[in-house]
Every structure is written in C-alpha cells, then in structure tokens.
C-alpha cells in the first residue's frame, strides 16, 4: 500500500469506537512524525464529529510533545544554551511560535544597551545602563511568581507583552549580559532568582538584583 493510501485508511479509522483499534491507528499516525500535522489539521477542519476532532487534537499534541521532548534531550546533551532552553519551554505552551521573532527582539534590546556601553564604565554603571534600557525604555516588568499564570513563564510572551515574572525577566537579563560580555551570573539561593555581577576574581559579587 502506498503511503498516501495508508494515511487515508488510517484517517478513516480515527473515529473507530474500538479503543484498541484507535490506539493502533494513533501510534501508526504518530510514527509519521511532524510532516503529517498539516494533513491532520486539514482533516480536523473537515470533520463534523466532535469526538473525532478531539482525537485529532490529541494526536497533534502528542506529535508536538514527542518532537519537543527530543529537542530538550538534545539541548541537555549539548551546550544547554540558556535562551534556547527558554524558547523550548515557550514552545510547549505555544507549539507554533516562531523563535526567530524572539531572537530579533532580543537583538534590538542588545543593540540599544550596547550603544550606551563603553569600556570605561564601572560594573555598577554597566548594570545601571542595562536596567535603564530594560526597565525604563522597554518597560519590562517582572512580578511575583504565580504558577497558574503560565504565559509569564514563557520568554516569547515576555518579549511581546513586556510582562513576565522573576524567572523570565531574570533569564532575559542573563541572556543580554552574556551577549554583551557583562559577567552577571545566577546565584543559587532556594526559592529566589538572584543575579550577581562577578569580578574576574570570581566569588565576590559587586552588585545583585532580585529582578522582581
């Protein structure tokens, strides 16, 4: 049987009342990977059966989750880039998000900070420049961590709305500092998101910010 005929046959069985049959159909569809999603979306749009639509939605979600899980594993086994990891978290909530938009927005912020920077600034002055651009010019706000406010944990929504929580604003702050070569690091304190400016001598922090 050709691939297109098999897919059509599988789609015809999506509304099968036998759960065992549907499970086998579902697993076979998932084996096709992400490229089958547009076909599933087209099927959803042209299906009047609500139960079948729910099954299609679940299959699409499982396909996206499977791909995202693989991306997280690759991220963990690679260089574990902070921004890329944050974007993967966003992708769980917004599977169709375009990461390039977030990269472009961060680059705009970085350039605005960079224009105000020079090699003669003290560590405190560097921090003040970053915070002035981030919090005064861009009006970024990081509030209290509220776990049912899911969007506030996603870096893409922070960049779009300029509203997040201590975690997402802290991640954005760290990413900007890394891009600008400013030695700001996260400090491991339980239930807190604290950042510190570390001198080249390493352990002594000359400035910290809770970013709340």
What are these regions (language model features)?
Residues 1-212:
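A structural boundary/capping signal
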């Amino acid at each position: 049987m050709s691939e297109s005929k098999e897919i059509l046959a599988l789609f015809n069985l999506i509304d099968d009342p036998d759960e065992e049959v549907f499970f086998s159909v579902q697993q076979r569809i998932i084996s096709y990977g992400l490229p089958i999603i547009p076909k599933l979306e087209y099927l959803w749009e042209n299906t009047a059966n609500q139960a079948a639509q729910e099954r299609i939605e679940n299959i699409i979600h499982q396909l996206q989750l499977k791909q995202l899980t693989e991306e997280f594993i690759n991220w963990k086994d690679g260089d574990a880039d902070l921004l890329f990891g944050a974007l993967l978290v966003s992708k769980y909530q917004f599977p169709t998000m375009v990461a390039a938009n977030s990269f472009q927005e961060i680059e705009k912020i970085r350039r605005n900070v960079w224009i105000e920077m020079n090699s003669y600034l003290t560590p405190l002055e560097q921090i003040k420049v970053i915070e002035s651009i981030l919090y005064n010019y861009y009006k970024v706000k990081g509030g209290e961590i509220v776990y049912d406010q899911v969007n506030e944990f996603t870096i893409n929504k922070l960049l779009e709305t300029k509203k997040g929580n201590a975690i997402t604003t802290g991640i954005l702050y760290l990413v900007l500092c890394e891009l600008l070569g400013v030695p700001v690091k996260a400090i491991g304190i339980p239930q807190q998101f604290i950042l510190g400016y570390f001198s080249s001598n390493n352990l002594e922090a000359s400035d910290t910010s809770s970013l709340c």
